Amino acid sequence: MYYRTQQKPASVLGANGFTAEVGGRDRVRYFRPPVEVAGVPMRYSGIDTVRFSATAPTTPNLPRTFAETRFDRPTSMAAGLVGPPHHLPSLPRRAGAAPPHPVKAKSVKLPPQRTKRVEKLASTIGTDGKCDAAMQTVFRENEAQTLPYTPNYYIPEGGDPNPQVLGLMELHWNEGLPAGKEEVELIQRLRRRRAVEASLLDETSKEAKMENFCKLYDLEVKEREEREQHFENLRKRRLDQIHEALQERERARDELNRQRLEKVKEQRLANLQRVIEQMESKRVGMGRKALAEQASKAPAAAGRGLYAVDPIETFKRKPDLIQTYARRGTGAVEPQLCTNNGGGSASASPRRDRSRKPLRNYRQYDIQPAMLKYEGGIAELEANKIPKIQQIAPNAFAAPENHAINSLPSLYQRREATRVVEALEYVHAKIHKSDTPAETIRVLELYRATPRPQRPDTPTLELEGDVNEAVEESCTLLQRLLRGRAVQNDFFDGKERCRGLIEELQAASNAKYAERSAEEKQAEAEEKMREAIADSIGNEAQGDIICDTLDYLFHEMTRQQDLLALEALRHEAEAVRAEREAREAELRAQERILHDKEAVQYAAYVRAIEDIVECYSHDLYATVAEECAMEEAIEAECQRLEQLPPPTSNILSDPEVAENLVCDVLDNFVLPAVIDMVRMKPEELDRKAPAAAAAGFRQRSPNEKETKE
């Protein structure tokens, strides 16, 4: 995309209470009236904060400056005092040049202080019109090299302590100087406001207040209108810049499209040339091969026998096989035109044998249509125009559906390809814009049709002494005209002399040609006639060659078009086949993924069933057997205890015996049973874990089926 350099906004007119920036390139280099920047203090003190450029420092308005300002008398402009006229330095004159006509200068009355200063300066000027001038610099080694330090300015006695020209001290080149039209208008507005505020009445009566209010109100209304006009100019300038930017962007875009189109055109032409060369080489090779096969199939002459040799063929120059294969057969054998397409038998008639001979004089036949030989046939052809040739059907170049773009895999690639195609169509429409019908006027065309803004007239500076300069310039111009006329006269004299010499040489040549004899003239006429006959024969031969070439090119073009159509059909069939193969591969991949998923689920289901069966069988074989053994042991012990006599009397009578009996029961029955239970608890958990996992799996499988459904 094309980017423009960021430009600084235009300056804004000064008004009440804000800083104004005045900038621009349409400024004049010098201006005569002084610039009043630091003026009288007023109620709107912010109006003095003015910058003459975007980079110029703002002139500070210190409170001390307002405190020291006095208004005992009006300013120089209000008092009507006019300073001395400003004269530009005169140009150096030649020693022998005549002095200009004296012009009566306008008399100016100067104050007594300035009269003394002028006399003092005149005394320093010598009688020869020269004077010495010194320059104060800041780069010096000691004070003896230059004049003593002097102040930058001085104020005469009785002068304004705060002259307006001091506002130019901090202005430099490209930082407020040189002043232009906008700066001058700003200075005039400042002076107008100062004049209005100086004319305000100091009385406190109602009439004085009303009069002051009317003056200030009119001034504010006028400044408001000027400010609105300035904003309107800024908007117009901005629109012009946008218009130029749009035009530049369109030009850059057209240039890029043109370059891209030229590049594509060169590439396509190079590819076409390469294909044409390949097809030409193949055609020549195939033609040579066909001629060789036809010659090999042709029967031998009956008079010479089967292995007879033609004496004429033996003396012919044999073709170089290496050179023939190096050139791919081009130019090795001239194509022969025969009336028959295949070989015949040896018993064919002589008429048929003569028909198989090549037609060596085929170029002498005129292939031009018979109707083009007389005027009536040409008129009839012009009257009966064939619509099929004269005009083309509107749907002949209908753009088919772009399969190349639609076959792209991603949407981003299709969008980018569509954008490129649209850009190429846009470039084609731009190139053939005159052939397309008139379209609706767009916004950019309206911008282009808009006339360019006219530059305002630059303010001119009229100084004293311009009349003398005009007289001097007119005299100089008159001298140049006189000298130029003299040089022009010399040029025309030389031209006339050359013309006379040329006429003399032509007359001598004509006389020499007239002195020749009749035999020489007749020989020259015969030579010209022979040249004309040779030119006519050459033109006729050239016409025959061009006609044959065009005929061959027409048939070759038809063949190339058929080949291109077949190639397009082949590409289309390959694209359809590739698309179908990709679709089938995608379906196969989905089926394979589903099959693998089902196989994994089935293996997990079988493994869970096997774990459940194993856990159940283990529980059946181990736990049930132990329980049965435990029950049998308990039952046997109970039966044994029933058979023993009751020891209750002995136990109750003897406490030591009872204690021993309890200890024996604990040692033999209780403690071993507890120890066995503690040791067998992990093994029991290991046995019951698969059953618990199988139960959880059975509970989770119905939930998953319900979520899938």
Curated annotation (Swiss-Prot):
Disruption phenotype: Knockdown of CFAP91 does not affect the cell morphology and the flagella appears normal in number and length. However, flagella exhibit an abnormal axoneme with a rotated central pair complex (CPC) and an impaired flagellar motility. GO terms for cellular component: axoneme; cilium; cytoplasm; motile cilium. Its main location: cytoplasm. GO terms for biological process: axonemal central apparatus assembly; cilium-dependent cell motility; regulation of cilium beat frequency. The keyword Translocase does not apply. It comes from the Eukaryota. InterPro entries: CFAP91, CFAP91_dom. It is found in: Cytoplasm, Cytoskeleton, Flagellum axoneme. Keywords: Cell projection, Cilium, Coiled coil, Cytoplasm, Cytoskeleton, Flagellum. Pfam families: CFAP91 (PF14738). Residues 94-116, 333-360, 690-709 are annotated as: Disordered. The keyword Amino-acid biosynthesis does not apply. PANTHER family: CILIA- AND FLAGELLA-ASSOCIATED PROTEIN 91. Belongs to the CFAP91 family. Axoneme-associated protein involved in flagellum motility and central pair positioning. This is Cilia- and flagella-associated protein 91.
